[in-house]
């Protein structure tokens, strides 16, 4: 029983509970070993982790400020957002890599360059054959393509003039200054016209 003395710690604690204010730590009775183990903060934290439902109930009964704190303390679900993100991203088609597009453009450019080089080689060979067919041109003379075409045009005009002047004279066309493809050697004009353009341009006639 209480003796009524102010220094009695149990009575002070009882009065503090009745007046709803905490008892000073200096006047609290000493806790026993078992009570200390229950009151340790580590046990409280472990109890809170093991009993999340109880914590949610306390948060529901608390004030708005404490509810906000409880919302912040709720653990986030790991992997939920990642699974949703992966599910949403799975429907999108992967974009083509920049390296493959650059390689495709480079291959197309290389193919176009190869075709252009082949065309220029064929054209150069054709001009070389035309230059060797022209008379009065030394073999070591370097002519441009334009000069070669001009000489060929003048040479063709000269041959046509010779054919018109010497036609059917002595029964044949004199072959002097005549080279391929104008070796007709006595053929009539009708036979000359029937010679195809391919034979005149691509082969020698005897």
From Swiss-Prot:
**Known PROSITE patterns for this protein?**
BHLH (PS50888)
* SMART domains for this protein: HLH (SM00353)
The GO cellular component terms are: chromatin; nucleoplasm; nucleus
As annotated in Swiss-Prot or TrEMBL, what is the tissue specificity of this protein? Expressed in lymphoid tissues, B-cell lines and activated B-cells.
Q: Where is the bHLH domain?
A: 107-159
Span of the annotated motif Nuclear localization signal? 71-76
Q: Where is the composition biased (Acidic residues)?
A: 46-56
Q: Name the residue ranges with Gly residues bias.
A: 78-92
* Gene3D superfamilies, alphabetized: Helix-loop-helix DNA-binding domain
Q: Where is the composition biased (Low complexity)?
A: 93-102
Lineage top rank: taxon: Eukaryota
**Coiled-coil ranges from the UniProt annotation:** none
Q: Where in the cell is it found?
A: Nucleus
Annotated InterPro entries: bHLH_dom, E-box_TF_Regulators, HLH_DNA-bd_sf
Which Pfam families does this one have? HLH
**Mind listing the GO biological process terms from this record?**
branchiomeric skeletal muscle development; cardiac conduction system development; cellular response to leukemia inhibitory factor; diaphragm development; regulation of DNA-templated transcription; regulation of transcription by RNA polymerase II; roof of mouth development; skeletal muscle tissue development
Region (Disordered) residue spans? 1-115
Q: Which UniProt keywords apply?
A: DNA-binding, Nucleus, Repressor, Transcription, Transcription regulation
Recall the GO molecular function terms of this protein's record: DNA-binding transcription factor activity; DNA-binding transcription factor activity, RNA polymerase II-specific; DNA-binding transcription repressor activity, RNA polymerase II-specific; protein dimerization activity; RNA polymerase II cis-regulatory region sequence-specific DNA binding; RNA polymerase II transcription regulatory region sequence-specific DNA binding; sequence-specific double-stranded DNA binding
Q: Per its database record, what is this protein's job?
A: Transcription repressor capable of inhibiting the transactivation capability of TCF3/E47. May play a role in regulating antigen-dependent B-cell differentiation.
On assembly, the entry states:
Efficient DNA binding requires dimerization with another bHLH protein. Binds DNA as a homodimer or a heterodimer. Forms a heterodimer with TCF3.
- List the protein's name: Musculin
Q: What is the lineage of its organism?
A: Eukaryota, Metazoa, Chordata, Craniata, Vertebrata
